[in-house]
C-alpha cells in the first residue's frame, strides 16, 4: 500500500462518512480510491438501512482503484459482507473517471464516463506532487484545468483528488473525503480551501480526535462538503472513539472565511481554550513585535536527492579512500544541533562519532579530472541507479549537488521537543531537513537568544503541523510570520548577553522550561510589558500545546 501512498481507513471514519453523505435510498455513490473497499461496504450498509434493494445498490455504487490486488479484494469483500456485485468498479487511474455532464470534448478510449453522483467518499493517496508522474500527472492536471482552476505551481496530490472529486458530484450532492491536515491548514492549502468555498455551500473540516492512520506519518482531516443548507465554513473536533458523529456535534466555530487572517484565527480557536485564544490574540498585537522575515532571509538547505549517497560519515570516506577535498562540512539532521551555537568542536564531535556530516561536492573549484577514488565512487552511484532519482534526473550532471551558502543560523524544519534557532559558528552547510537563515541584524546572539520565549514558542506550535511521533514541521513561508522581538530597540541586548551562557547550556540539555524561566521575564516582561499573570498564561498555553503534541 505504501507504493500508492495508501493507508487503509478504519471502520469508524468510513461509517461516519457514509452515514453523513448518503441521505436517501436512491443516492448514487462514488469511492474515489477504493482500496480494500471499506467505504463501499459502509455505503452499501447505509443504503440498505434507508431501504435500497441489493439490485439497486449494485447499480448505485461506483469506484476507482489503481491497484489490481486491492481491486480484487474490494470486490470480494463487498460480495461476501454485503451480497453486492457491481460492474461499476473501475480498475485504473481515478483521473480517467469523468462525469458524463463534462464529456462534451473528445475523449480518449481510457476515459470512464459515469453519471454525476449524489455522494462522493474516499481516502485518496497521501502522496506529494513529485510522486505523481508521466501520464497520471498529465491526466490529473487536465482534470483540474477542466474544473476551471489554473495551478501556479506544484500542489499536493490530495488537492488534485479533492478538486476532481468535486467535479463528479451533482449540483445537490455531498462530499466526504479524508485528506492530510497539511492540505487544508497551511498557507499553500489556500487553493483547496478556496475551491471548497466556491463549490459547496457548507464545508465542515473535522479534526479526528482519537482516530488516525497508525501507518501514516501525519494527521488527517475529514472534509464534509454539501450543496445544501446554510452557507458556512467550519472547523470542529470529533472524538470517534466516543461515538460522536459530525451529524450531532456542534462546530467549534462557524463563520465565513474571506481572508487569510480570518482563517488563521479560526484555526487557532480550535487549538486553544477561549481564555488562551483571547490572551494570544491580544499578545500578538503588541506594537513592539516583529515577524522573523523582517530580519532574516529564510531558505531551505541543500537538496541532494539521495542523502544516503551524498552525505556520508568518516567510516564510508575511509572505506572508499575518498579525498577530503571533495567534501563540505554539513549538518544533516535536527538532532545534530542542540545548543544556542553550533561550533567547530560540535562538528568535530559529529565526525568523531561517525555521524553523517560530510557532503560530497564536486564543482568547478576542483581538479578538471576527479581523483580515481571519486570516479570509482561515482561509478558505484551509477550502478546503484542513484542518477535516476527524481531530483538528480533533472540536473545537467547528476552528481553535482547545488550547495547553498553557509548560513548565519540554522532552524530545525522538523522538531520533536521544540524548534531550535541555532547560530552557525562554522563553515558547515545544511541539508533541506534544516532551514537556512541569513540575518540582517547586528546582534545575532541577542536576537537568537530572545527567540526562546513563551509567545514565540507558542506561535511555532500554532503555525506548524504535527506529524507522527509528535514531530512539529514548519515550512519556510510559515517561519517568516513567527513573531519575535528586536532586542536592541527594546534595550534588552545587555540583559540577554548576561544570560546567553545559561541559555546555551540549558538548550544543550533540552531544558526548555529552564530557558523560559530566564528569557520570559526579559523579553515578555521588560521588553513587551506583560505582567506576570499574562506571561504565565502564555506559558501555560504553550506547554499544554507542546505536551499534547509530544505525548
Language-model segments: which ranges?
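Signature of N6-adenine DNA methyltransferases within the class I
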Residues: 2-3, 8-16, 33-41, 66-72, ...
